[in-house]
Amino acid sequence: MEKRKVVWDLCSGLGGWTEAFVQDGWVVIRIEINPELEYVPFTRIWDVKDWIDWIDDLPHPDLIVASPPCTEFSCADWRKDRNTFEPDMSIVKACLDIIDYIKPKWWVFENVKGACPYIRKLIGHHKQFIGPFFLWGNFPSIEDRRLRRYKKDIAGKKSRQRTAQEVAMIPFEMSFQLKRAIETQTRIDRWC
């Protein structure tokens, strides 16, 4: 029997990044600081900045996905001159420190366009972007043709106000396409 693959979802919010992995039987560990989200399955309420306290107690991941809060980078939140604005990068750095310490086979770091100049200073240019989602990391390219509909939905009117977590949630289709890309790459690796 093949060992179950493990994914860690840092700053997981509602868990959108890893939903396809849950459905496929991966071991999913979601790390989130907001106690209001403890109801989300597989979520542990921990601070990524305190990672040294809990990291060695978890199974080693094949994949780490990280989506630090984007409020620091949102264009709508820039209240200061863009040339002097310096966001708090502590959560971003903690996520990157975890990735560097663990060295998983695959990792994806997601944030908004406004984060690009700041994250670029730490890990270079983004690898891929899909709609409002900018992606850095070591991962097979995600097919985005099926995600075009989502790009239109983002601006659509909703019958109710969405929570910050709902707005920030990675759509299931992105989770599915990432899982599919990793599975395809794994099959190619076995064949070579």
Where would I find each of the regions flagged by the language model?
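Phosphate-coordination loops involved in phosphoryl transfer and adenosine-cofactor binding
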Residues: 2-4
